[in-house]
A protein has these predicted regions:
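Conserved RNAP core-binding helix
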Residues: 3, 25, 33, 43-60
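Internal acidic/polar
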Residues: 1-6, 84, 91-117
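N-terminal module of bacterial RNA polymerase sigma factors
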Residues: 1-31, 38
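Amphipathic, non-transmembrane alpha-helical scaffold segments
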Residues: 21-29, 75, 113, 117
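Structural recognition of an alpha-helix C-terminal capping motif at a helix-to-coil junction
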Residues: 48-55, 68-80
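Sigma70-family region 2
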Residues: 14, 38-41, 52-69, 88-90
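Arg/Lys-rich amphipathic alpha helix in sigma70-family domain 2
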Residues: 59-66, 76-96, 109-110
Length: 117
């Protein structure tokens, strides 16, 4: 599928965009999945990122510009999705680290109290 066909499908909507997305999936899934796997290092996370990317392609198809190429545009969406995922994971890891630190401090206080007593 070329960019003009994609733009036409976006304008038509409905089944046309569904067919376009299936064609894009068939053409680009493997490339996008490998990029996702290389970045995220997790099969399920990479698969989820690619699926989410195609959902975003569908939602944002009206923003695609004629002078752009499809694959770089889709890859940019994927990269942004992966960055968001990594930020969320870092926040979750940071919160877990904070919880461990609080627990460690509590335990140190207990042991200090026992040593003094």
């Amino acid at each position: 599928m070329d960019r003009l066909d994609f733009m036409q499908a976006c304008r038509e909507g409905g089944r046309a965009i569904e067919r376009a997305l299936r064609a894009l999936d068939a053409a680009y899934f493997d490339v996008l999945f490998r990029e996702g796997l290389r970045t995220l290092r997790d099969t399920e996370a990479a698969r989820d990122a690619v699926q989410e990317t195609f959902i975003k392609v569908w939602r944002r198809c009206s923003t695609f510009q004629a002078q752009s190429e499809l694959l770089p545009w889709i890859r940019a969406i994927l990269r942004n999705d992966m960055l968001d995922r990594m930020r969320r994971n870092n926040r979750e890891l940071s919160l877990e680290d904070d919880a461990v630190s609080v627990e460690a401090e509590r335990r140190i206080d207990e042991l200090s109290s026992q040593a003094i007593a």
